[in-house]
Amino acid sequence: MFEEGWFDLVLETPDVDKMKKVRFWDLAATAEVKGKNPDYTVGALVGFLEGRYYILDIQRLRGTPGEVQLRIEMTAEMDDDGVQICMEQEPGASGVNTIDHYARNVLAGYIFKGVKSSGSKQERARVFSSACEMGNVKVRRDRWTKALIDECVQFPKGSHDDQVDAISGAINQLGAEVKKKKVRIIL
């Protein structure tokens, strides 16, 4: 779904303050264990400006639920006040409880919401993939860039898809906001 050459790496991003930004979290809660390869918790910060998506930051860790919660809280403090924070709401009561816990106890005072996913991971990644192919995704060059691109190129057959999931969630959320602002006239 992705090719390495589709990613445009940039050292600086234009007008970050003017961007609509979403930090989307894909949760996991398993600490790193020798001999195992558990999923990562990933928080992808994506901006949108003038028809282009900018991958501005990736927070990625393997940790206990307490370590994950602390990273999410610290990242919210680090991000701009206008960043919308989203998190995938897993099905069932546990998903509802997780979102409620974060809304009341961890991210109170921030723009936060849970997002129910629908469709397969590949379906949810289509907008991200298409935008990359068209040259409409810019990636800030950073220590996390190589791991991100490697994971994308291996998707959906790679051992991990957490960064793809988080970025897809952010891009889909930003796309939903853009669609709300468009006015359609039917003749």
Residues of each region from the PLM?
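Mg2+-dependent endonuclease catalytic cores in nucleic-acid-processing enzymes, primarily RNase H-like
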Residues: 42-44, 49-155
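Structural motif
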Residues: 34-35, 121, 157-163
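Acidic two-metal-ion nuclease catalytic site recognized across multiple nuclease folds
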Residues: 3, 9-10, 170-187
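Short, flexible loop/turn motifs enriched in small residues
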Residues: 34-42
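Active-site-proximal flexible loops/turns
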Residues: 33, 95, 169-172
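ATPase catalytic-site recognition across NTP-hydrolyzing enzymes
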Residues: 1-32
